[in-house]
UniProtKB/Swiss-Prot annotation:
Belongs to the type-II 3-dehydroquinase family. The keyword Amino-acid biosynthesis applies. It comes from the Bacteria. The record marks R21 as: Transition state stabilizer. It is an enzyme of class 4 (lyase). One of its GO terms (biological process) is amino acid biosynthetic process. This is 3-dehydroquinate dehydratase. Catalyzes a trans-dehydration via an enolate intermediate. The keyword Chloroplast does not apply. The active site is at Y26, H103. GO terms for molecular function: 3-dehydroquinate dehydratase activity. The lineage of its organism: Bacteria, Pseudomonadati, Pseudomonadota, Gammaproteobacteria, Pasteurellales. Pfam families: DHquinase_II (PF01220).
Length: 148
């Protein structure tokens, strides 16, 4: 029997405040609800999903490093680190795990400083502006990608 594919969902700073933080941009669902919904989908897709959120760059980098040869695909919402973190980008490149970048809001409809991402050019794909559904689409893509 083949081993379950392992997918890691990484969420960056302030996403622990989903549901109360700027719901016009980020929606009204909590991160816990989003993660529970994704766990149900992961079971349907017969993949193993682990979830991790941190407000510190160091903790996110450590989690990426720990994923080396342990995780098959990463779904990441780097949040504000999208626009600032060369270190997170380098960590993803170092472990060479394919990933999709997800943003709840359409970053291109927001402030100009949010228009640049340190991740998009090295990601398998980018999903933005679709709210919590974006995570579902990312998981669906990850499953499809891993079947190749």
């Amino acid at each position: 029997m083949s081993q379950l594919k392992r997918i890691l969902l990484l969420n960056g700073p302030n996403l622990n405040m989903l549901g109360v933080r700027e719901p016009t941009h980020y929606g009204s669902l909590s991160l816990k609800t989003i993660e529970q919904d994704l766990q149900s989908l992961a079971q349907q897709y017969a993949v193993e999903l682990s979830c991790f959120q941190a407000n510190s760059e160091e903790k996110l980098i450590e989690k990426i490093h720990q994923s080396f040869q342990q995780i098959d695909f990463i779904i990441i919402n780097p949040a504000a680190f999208t626009h600032t973190s060369v270190a997170l980008r380098d960590a993803l490149l170092a472990v060479a795990i394919p990933f999709v970048e997800v943003h709840l809001s359409n970053v291109h409809k927001r402030e100009p400083f949010r228009h640049h991402s340190y991740f998009s050019d090295v990601a398998e794909g980018v999903i933005c502006g679709l709210g919590a559904k974006g995570y579902e689409f990312a998981l669906q893509f990850a499953v499809s990608f891993l079947k190749k």
